[in-house]
Amino acid sequence: AFCSPMVGSQVQRDKGYETSTIKPGYMKPKHEIDPTKTIMRMDGEDPAQLNDPTYRRMRLITGNMRRQINAIKARVEWLAVNAVTTGKNIIEGEGIERYEIDWKIPENCIIQQASGKKWSQQDKDMHDPIYDIELYADQAGCPANVMIMGGEVWRTLRSFKKFRELYDLSRGSESAAELACKNLGEVVSFKGYLGDLALIVYSGKYTDSDGTEKYFLEPDLLVLGNTNNKGLVAYGAIMDQEAVRTGATQNMYYPKNWIEDGDPAIEYVQTHSAPQPIPADIRKFVTVKIA
């Protein structure tokens, strides 16, 4: 505001902020080292140059640790996708009471196609899905430059004539979205552009606790966002007395390997971690469930 140069100025009010505390879910996958596997030839082992049991034991230990870390990373991915697509993370498991982390995503950022607006009900030669996408993107708190979708969304989009006419395959490999996908060829497919909007199909899967394979991102979901909106993964303290004693409570992962005496003695491998993805600004994402 304007004021007289002869009058003392007013102190401006600082911008406010809000803080909150969350309790991350705790993980500690565990495997037993089977001694019978140390006396048998392992996969990839040369029959003419067999390794000794000590080598095989170390290979079992490192292999199990690798699997445990991969399982933890898969859970981080699951948490991140759920945070963006539902606005919440549900934490439940053995020995803990179920609780919810609410990221307070605005209601307009979670969209489900209603009757009359469903893409499955539209004329494939006349309907313009690009107009719908622009309306969805307007709900985000910033301009969208990337659209990540499940396989069903991509198949539906390609069925519209107007989409095929404007879909751009020719642009070079310079976008942040495309570079981010470079090493994820098995589960991520960069399809091209729709104007300035990078199009990515994500088909990553994980194995649930009941042994069934499930998609991280459901095939009928699309997510609009901006590649400059980056979150982070926070980690809770390692809740293990050995970690406390050695000053390792702030680690991302805390691997353990020990032998329990007995008849017979049993050896275990375990990895502790308490990860929780934090959306930087969740209102800048829009999720749409197509029908």
For the regions a protein language model found, what residue spans apply to each?
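Short, glycine/acidic-rich hinge or "gate" loops at secondary-structure transitions
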Residues: 77-95
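Contiguous, amphipathic alpha-helical segments that mediate oligomerization or scaffolding
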Residues: 58, 71, 75-82
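Extended, solvent-exposed, turn-rich assembly/linker loops in the middle of proteins
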Residues: 97-178
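RNA-binding accessory domains that recognize and position tRNA/RNA substrates
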Residues: 68
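Extracellular structured ligand-interaction cores
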Residues: 62, 144, 266
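Assembly/oligomerization interface modules of large self-assembling protein complexes
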Residues: 1-47
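Sequence/fold signature of self-assembling virion shell proteins
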Residues: 164-291
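Active-site-proximal, glycine-rich beta->alpha crossover segments in alpha/beta enzymes
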Residues: 39-63
